[in-house]
A protein has these predicted regions:
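Active-site-adjacent substructure of cysteine-protease-like catalytic cores
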Residues: 88-108, 325-400
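Noncatalytic regulatory segments and standalone regulatory/sensor domains
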Residues: 37-63, 89-103, 109-188, 404-411, ...
Length: 457
């Protein structure tokens, strides 16, 4: 990953990212305080506080190691799971527990949770390592993330009327051995990891990934780097924009543009780092890089190449996306740029889709950045059944948004479905989490394309 700070903003460079949120630590903590603490707060505030037993119950029900295939009849039963829970760490201020870190034994990962039970509490989780709050370097940007979450909890304590009381009423008995919670997926697209953010459907149409799946072999290795100077990596800016141009030209159920500068014929989907098609794609990627001002090539073999976000924006305009803009990441904006209506045949508007480009810094080091391609969406829904002494007392449906990401890291680089709403990009297919969520941004208006007026070179 290549990085630097610049007046024009984030430098986005290709890299193989470390997928662990925090370091593995071994230092000991003092004994945990009473998780509810001594307090003079109102009973409303006390009622939404989460106990350690409830935190563990959430981890057992929603933990990342749980898969649909691992339980009979595709159901997850909180009462039946025997997860190897280890140390439970506490982040405490003024004798009030604000955050929990529930660790699995043998450093097999952890789950970070808010201590408020008035909304979905899981903040982040990892499938490796161990989290102890006292071991986090205060200079690490991730400490700022934790402080931000702690401030959010304190704000909810001070304003209990903001709590989602319906959510609390549904989930207040989790961790009570007399109650059982079951989850059953109801979406058409399978999900191996279940969690939800809301209890209503947005009604958004599913967008099936096309280019993101077709170009799963594209990466910054081997023949894809053939035309990069100094035998450096071709760079994620060129790779991501290349996927976008392929999407414009080849995407089914999209407005298929006549893309000639550079041209990405059908063989581009066959390209790998080891075949001749990969070399042909590399030539087109070099043309893209040459269209991006101030493209920073790696100085020696294997070095990553990079570009600033504002320069990538200028390059997009040169390549035909003349109305392209750069905006902070917002899911609604993202979806509106992926799915829209267009005149394709005759006077009737048709539903079409196009992939988008997302860029962000890494939470562990915001000076490092990446840009990637996103072209799929679906709304995950599942039914939750609450039982008392194994007798059903209530059932409801919850929902979450999922996005299909192609990171440009090759077939084993984590391409697939991720939750759109987490503080990190959480895979729902067993891939490690991706922590590219520092000041994320979207390149918008990519639906508008005009073939460049200059000749191919």
């Amino acid at each position: 990953m290549r990085t630097s700070l610049h007046p024009n903003g984030l430098l986005i460079g290709g890299f193989i990212v470390s997928l662990l949120l925090l370091c593995c630590c071994n230092s000991e903590l003092p004994s945990a305080p009473d998780p509810l603490g001594e307090t003079t707060e109102s009973s409303d505030v006390e009622s939404i506080k989460m106990t350690p037993d409830q935190a563990i119950a959430y981890v057992r029900l929603f933990g990342e190691e749980i898969t649909v295939a691992s339980t009979p009849e595709n159901k997850l039963r909180a009462a039946d799971l025997d997860r190897q829970i280890g140390l439970v760490d506490y982040y405490v201020e003024n004798n009030d527990t604000l955050l929990y870190a529930v660790n699995y034994k043998d450093e097999k990962g952890y789950v970070l949770l808010s201590s408020n039970n008035g909304g979905f509490p899981i903040i982040a989780h990892s499938d490796a390592g161990e989290l102890r709050f006292s071991d986090i370097d205060k200079e690490n940007p991730l400490w700022l993330v934790i402080m931000s979450e702690a401030e959010r909890v304190k704000d909810q304590r001070e304003n209990p009327d903001r709590a989602n009381l319906d959510y609390y009423d549904d989930w207040k008995d989790i961790g009570n051995p007399d109650y059982q919670y079951e989850i059953e997926p109801t979406s058409e697209v399978p999900s191996s990891r279940l969690r939800a953010m809301r209890k209503h459907s947005t009604g958004k149409k599913t967008i099936y990934p096309y280019t993101g799946e077709k170009l799963s072999n594209w990466c910054q290795f081997g023949n894809f780097n053939t035309y990069a100077p100094n035998q450096a990596a071709i760079g994620c800016p060129a790779l991501a924009v290349g996927m976008l141009l392929y999407d414009c030209h080849q995407r089914m159920l999209g407005k298929m543009e006549h893309v000639t500068v550079p041209r990405f014929p059908y063989y581009a989907e066959r390209a790998t780092k080891d075949n001749e098609d990969g070399k042909r794609v590399s030539m087109a990627l070099r043309q893209i890089a040459d269209s991006i001002p101030n493209y920073q090539w790696g100085a020696k073999p294997g070095d990553y190449s990079a570009a600033y976000a504002v320069d990538i924006l200028e390059g997009l305009k040169k390549l035909g996306f003349r109305q392209a803009e750069l905006h902070p990441y917002d899911f609604e904006t993202l979806y509106q740029n992926m799915s829209y209506k267009e005149y394709i045949y005759g006077p009737k508007l048709s539903n079409v889709s196009r992939g988008v480009l997302i860029g962000a810094g890494h939470l562990r080091n915001p000076r490092e950045g990446h840009i990637w391609f996103c072209d799929g969406y679906y709304e995950q829904s599942y039914t939750v059944t609450k039982k008392f002494l194994f007798i059903k007392i209530k059932s409801w449906t919850e929902y979450d948004d999922r996005l299909y990401m192609n990171w440009g890291w090759g077939p084993k680089g984590g391409n697939g479905w991720y939750s759109a709403d987490d503080n990190v990009w959480t895979s729902i297919e067993g891939n490690p989490e991706v922590y590219l969520k520092y000041r994320p941004m979207i390149f918008t208006n990519l639906r508008y394309y005009t073939s460049p007026e200059y000749s191919q070179h």
